[in-house]
C-alpha cells in the first residue's frame, strides 16, 4: 500500500544502523535523525546505559556513504555532557551533518524533580559557548521548522530546538510513530492513536482509516507552548 507521504524519516539511536543498512537503503528512506549526546565512550555508556559508541559512529559513516541525509540530535545537559557541545559540532561540520541541539525537555522523571532545572542548558548559553569557537549567523528556517537555524560560513549549519527558550508549538506539523505502533500528535500530550489495526485492512479501507487516524492525532496538538509530559521521550521518538 502506497501512503502518498511526501516525507518520512527514521529517528534512531544508531545501534542497529550497521545491521539494518540494507533494509534502510532499500526502503527508500532518504533522511535519518540520529540521537547522539557525546563522542566520549565513557559518557556514552553513562548516558545511553547500553550499546556501543563505535557501532553508532560506524553506522553513521556507512549511511553517509550510501547518500542518506543525516541530522544528529544532541541534548546538552549541565554536569553531564556540556563539555561535548563544541566537539559534537566540530564532528558534524566535518562530515556535512547538521547538528541539532535540543533543549532538555521537561518529560519523564524530570517532570516531577529538580533535575530539570539543575541540568537545563538554554539556547542563550549554547550560543555563547559556540561563539567562543565558531563564527555563525542566524538564518531563515521554513515556517514549520522546529529548529532555530544557524550557518557557519564555509562549513555548514546547525540548529537549536529551543522548546523552552523559543517554543515552536504554533507551527509544529510533526506526527510521531512509536516503535509499538502508536501515533503521537504532541509531546505535551500522552494521548496516542493505535495504528496496528490498520495493518490488517485492505488498501482502500486502510487508506481511509489512516487519514482519519492522522486527523485525530493532529487534534491532539496544543499550540500555546510546551508544558511537558510524564511520558518518557525514548518511547515516542524524537
Question: Residue ranges of each PLM-predicted region?
Answer:
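Proteins with a high burden of low-complexity, intrinsically disordered sequence enriched in S/T/G/P/A and R
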Residues: 1-9, 215-219, 236
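Radical SAM/AdoMet-radical enzyme domain recognition
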Residues: 1-102
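Noncatalytic linker/hinge segments flanking ATPase motor cores
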Residues: 19, 23, 50-56, 72-79, ...
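Glycine-centered flexibility motif
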Residues: 51, 59, 66, 108, ...
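Short, charge-patterned binding micro-sites
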Residues: 105
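Accessory C-terminal segments flanking Radical SAM cores
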Residues: 108-225
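Intrinsic disorder and flexible/low-complexity segments
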Residues: 228-237
Amino acid at each position: 500500500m502506497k501512503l502518498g507521504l511526501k516525507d518520512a524519516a527514521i529517528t534512531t539511536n544508531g545501534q542497529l544502523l550497521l545491521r539494518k543498512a540494507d533494509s534502510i537503503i532499500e526502503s527508500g528512506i532518504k533522511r535519518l535523525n540520529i540521537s547522539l549526546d557525546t563522542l566520549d565512550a565513557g559518557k556514552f555508556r553513562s548516558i545511553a546505559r547500553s550499546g556501543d559508541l563505535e557501532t553508532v559512529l560506524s553506522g553513521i559513516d556507512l549511511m553517509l556513504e550510501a547518500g542518506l541525509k543525516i541530522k544528529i540530535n544532541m541534548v546538552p545537559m549541565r554536569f553531564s555532557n556540556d563539555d561535548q557541545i563544541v566537539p559534537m559540532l566540530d564532528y558534524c561540520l566535518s562530515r556535512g551533518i547538521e547538528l541539532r541541539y535540543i533543549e532538555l525537555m521537561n518529560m519523564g522523571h524530570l517532570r516531577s524533580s529538580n533535575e530539570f532545572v539543575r541540568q537545563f542548558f538554554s539556547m542563550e548559553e549554547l550560543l555563547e559557548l559556540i561563539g567562543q569557537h565558531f563564527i555563525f549567523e542566524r538564518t531563515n528556517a521554513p515556517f514549520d521548522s522546529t529548529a532555530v537555524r544557524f550557518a557557519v560560513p564555509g562549513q555548514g549549519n546547525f540548529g537549536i530546538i529551543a522548546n523552552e527558550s523559543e517554543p515552536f508549538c504554533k507551527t509544529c506539523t510533526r506526527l510521531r510513530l512509536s516503535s509499538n505502533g502508536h501515533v503521537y500528535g504532541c509531546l505535551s500530550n500522552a494521548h496516542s492513536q493505535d495504528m496496528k489495526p490498520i495493518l490488517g485492512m485492505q488498501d482502500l479501507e486502510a487508506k481511509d482509516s489512516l487519514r482519519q487516524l492522522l486527523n485525530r492525532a493532529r487534534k491532539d496538538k496544543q499550540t500555546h507552548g510546551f508544558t511537558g509530559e510524564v511520558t518518557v521521550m525514548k518511547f515516542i521518538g524524537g
